Amino acid sequence: MQHDDVIWDVVGNKQFCSFKIKTKTQNFCRNEFNITGLCNRSACPLANSQYATIKEEKGICYLYMKTIERAAFPARMWERVRLSKNYEQALEQIDENLIYWPRFIRHKCKQRFTKITQYLIRIRKLTLKRQRKLVPLSRKVERREKRREEKALVAAQLDNAIEKELLERLKQGAYGDIYNFPIQAFDKALEQQDEASASESSDEEEEDDEESGKREFVEDDDVEESDLSDFEDMDKLGASSDEDKPSSESEEESSGEEDEKEEKAPKAKSKGKAPLKGHLIRKRPHVEIEYEQETEPQQKAKVT
């Protein structure tokens, strides 16, 4: 059996307790189940067999209750009840569960619950509110950073000026090859040229695709002027043959001699490779014409 007075005489009255903290004015208790935090007979969780308190775990409040019936079972000594987040409903739960407890414990439980809810609300406000964080900086560091910023601006301006100058020289053709200069500017220019050439090639391909379906009429290159002239000469000869039927055989012989001379002339010229002067002599086709004469009407005339 548990005797509360005996426990208090051993622990509280000027005796040793591991949870006790002595000061010049008052003694405090470090036990987590202590309802007030003070070391006295009414608030001691060890010397009271019927006891209750409020604890907070991860933003949730719980009501812990201890009775003398569970004193022989340390693992099941405390009964825990979860309280509602609504303040009024939580107070009603405390009154319902602590009907037969002393009035002092009931009042202190309500007081402890109000304090816990207040600091939980304060924590939520602080987490939502933005706070300024002051970081001390020495003057030397500020001066150093300003100098670095100024140097960086000057270097950036110089780099831009050098890049423009190099691009102008490259466009003018001052450099035959790329030397040990900053290569980034040249790379940018080359990329732009490649993009321009790629766009031109794509335009040409599009034009070819557009013109692929068109139809055109083209002259025949195989037909030469000499062939056309030969056809014209044939027509002329045909016409002249109809007109010159009564011509004599002497004309045939003279034409044959002229043809032989013309055949010999190119053979003599072909021996050397001298350039030809004037117009080329076109060869005419050799044509043999046979004439038939009728003598019967003349004989009839003589007979008459």
Curated annotation (Swiss-Prot):
Q: Which UniProt keywords apply?
A: Nucleus
Q: What InterPro entries does the annotation carry?
A: Mak16 (IPR006958), Ribosomal_eL28/Mak16 (IPR029004)
Basic residues composition bias: which ranges? 267-285
Q: Where is the composition biased (Acidic residues)?
A: 201-211, 218-233, 249-261
The protein's superkingdom reads Eukaryota
The keyword Nucleus is assigned to this record:
yes
What processes in GO biological process is this protein linked to? maturation of 5.8S rRNA; maturation of LSU-rRNA
Q: Which GO terms describe its cellular component?
A: nucleolus; preribosome, large subunit precursor
> Where's it found, cell-wise?
Nucleus, Nucleolus
What Pfam families has UniProt attached to this entry?
Mak16 (PF04874), Ribosomal_L28e (PF01778)
Q: Region entry Disordered: which residue ranges?
A: 190-304
SS bond partners: none
* Family per similarity comment: Belongs to the MAK16 family.
User: What's the name of the protein?
Assistant: Protein MAK16 homolog B
Upper lineage: Eukaryota, Metazoa, Chordata, Craniata, Vertebrata
- The encoding gene is mak16-b
